[in-house]
């Protein structure tokens, strides 16, 4: 039956005055088998015939009402038919259409196929346009005083239906899907809104006008449905921000600024921290770090981090794109400083430690960078000066002897740039001038200040490259006298010492460059990789690098054993350094076999350290590797040689800057030997009261199982409420010693012990910051091993009950989002890049996913089958049930993190479909809720893209997730299939 025949049937029924049920019986008899009334446009045909005259045909309208009541026609087809009527001057017709809408507008739903649900979305969008156009038409006519009351009544009728439609979040969600499905149709909405807004001035009734404005506002809010955030948290302290800043200041001064900014923004977004409190937490952590850092290098590092790096971080935060910006970032910084001024004891303690007004210096730095206005800077400075009048002071004599580190660091920063320029210049003709600059750098704590300033401003790598180049310079010898030979020796020695110091203070990754096939690897890089002892690095004393040509070794031994002074002319220092370990081995063997006396060995070690300290460092580097291989009773003589090499020479016959060079050499050797001397309970130098020999070394308590050490330290941190530098170093040691799985698993067990909600929340924040020690690997372990075991083993389900279960869900989502975001942007921190671990799993073989073939995928997406058969039950591991947005976005499934996320969501999906409820399903619910709360809406970086589409229908069975906004949030609305699945789920609510 074609539509024309349908019209004839309607006319026949009207002529013969059939009742509504007679009409229904007769029309069904003549309808072709299998055809649907929507396909035949029954609703449109009935309305078309009913609305021919100036008033509606009541009999034909009764047929339509019967069809709606008996579900012969769908709501979407009726709404579409209504929206095609455009003659608003026929008020009776419009009134009848609105009454038809009233029959079902309060129960708009669809339980059919996804395509039918999308049809309902489109129909609702058309209805919104129609109602807006109707309101605009009546508003425009209100300017005419004739028939004012009738027009206002019609306007009110249209408005009531529109308000009824739009006040439902479900309806707005369906319109939102239609907007994404058909962008062109949304243009009609915008035009209708514009026309209505233009004519609002004609409405004189204030209540009516206010209602119209409210409806317009609701329509405009539809595109931003997912941007509306919940209220910010009520608490004012955020341990995760505090601890993350402590971690970065303690362990990652050399890290790039942008990854730090991204990570901070991720924390701010996930916890919805107000900007002033966020900035305040950063400053609180900086001041805490300044106060508690050990004297020496660590104190300088914290000073550089606080006064140089953090202002730059804030500058980038100011420029960071933020959607819902409510006020200027400079005002946020100002408010944060006002809050900070209330923490007088913290500021006083920092001022005492640094011997200066720390806050005033920070305010000046922020003002220079445009983070604070002049007026605010002056007000805050005056307030702090007033508070300092009552602060406890150090004694005047003590004050006079202490130069404030913040001032020194701020002055060192421009000096770094000048030194880089100086070193870059051509010194081949007169290297003496450069030697003077280097000598000045060695005096006092100048070198440490310059290195800290360079590290905080991202110039340390450039600094190191320049000194590696300088270390290569003495290789080139051409007819030289004794003066130029000594200058060449000093240039080599000072650059070598500086580079060793940089490695021990900031890590070898600062020095090592990316391998280039064309250029030769510099000497120092080669020596560093093969010969230099570092924490956690074991060297083989029999490695070929310690065994150069025997002829060179013999001549060096003879030179060291002679009574005459070592000649510097034509000396190839790089070769000497490489030959020194073998020469030391010869000397040690001779001493152990009674060929050499103690006095003879002392003379040889004096010769080694007498001119260039680099030789002593190379000798001790090998001795440390050698001692590690010996039993405790065999170590006496090698350790005696180490002590001899560490003791400075007292004679006058030494090269320039000897005292300064020896100070650095002693520090380098002390770091090298700390581990081997600790094993025998010996020390290299007498301990100074109140000062650790080397900060953060040997933190693990003796004779205590590492699990107990971990539990004990974590309990201390939990009671304290924040993680200090000492704790971070201890946690890192435990992470290295126990491995990623052991570390993560035991800390998760600590979390699952917490049965109090507020304590469980605190544990989450602290664990998140501790896991930043190696976010990527810990996240892989947490999501790939620990959660699957807890979810699949019924014996563990009880531990997933709230509150610890919800806390674990929050922690898992935070880790997953942070890892995915930094991984997605390729921003692993230097601290994480440098780790080499043997316990890292091969996640590709561990989780063999069916890497969906594109041809299969396209066949699946173009299928016209019912979704119930296309997307089978979650328990089925077929290709269709595992289909997720990530596969349609062609995300690389061979990447470990992507693979683990995909498998976790498959597991969660199967748990939901297993029909067994319990704490594990409660955990799944919490996990998805956290994903929705924390994810950036509309972002491709959301981990929800790994969720199978079939999981949506299972999630809406959980009461707390059966919300339109939640469904919109968990589906990828940029994909047609995502929109269909969302429409199907929402339309059924």
Curated annotation (Swiss-Prot):
The keyword Transcription applies. It comes from the Eukaryota. A motif (LXXLL motif 2) lies at residues 359-363. A motif (LXXLL motif 1) lies at residues 343-347. A motif (LXXLL motif 6) lies at residues 857-861. It holds the Pfam family Med24_N. Component of the Mediator complex, a coactivator involved in the regulated transcription of nearly all RNA polymerase II-dependent genes. Mediator functions as a bridge to convey information from gene-specific regulatory proteins to the basal RNA polymerase II transcription machinery. Mediator is recruited to promoters by direct interactions with regulatory proteins and serves as a scaffold for the assembly of a functional preinitiation complex with RNA polymerase II and the general transcription factors. Required for proliferation of enteric nervous system precursors. It is found in: Nucleus. One of its GO terms (cellular component) is mediator complex. GO terms for biological process: enteric nervous system development; interstitial cell of Cajal differentiation; positive regulation of transcription initiation by RNA polymerase II; retinal cone cell development; thymus development. A motif (LXXLL motif 3) lies at residues 447-451. The keyword Cytoplasm does not apply. A motif (LXXLL motif 5) lies at residues 787-791. Belongs to the Mediator complex subunit 24 family. Its main location: nucleus. This is Mediator of RNA polymerase II transcription subunit 24. A motif (LXXLL motif 4) lies at residues 556-560. Keywords: Activator, Developmental protein, Differentiation, Neurogenesis, Nucleus, Repeat, Transcription, Transcription regulation. GO terms for molecular function: transcription coregulator activity. Component of the Mediator complex.
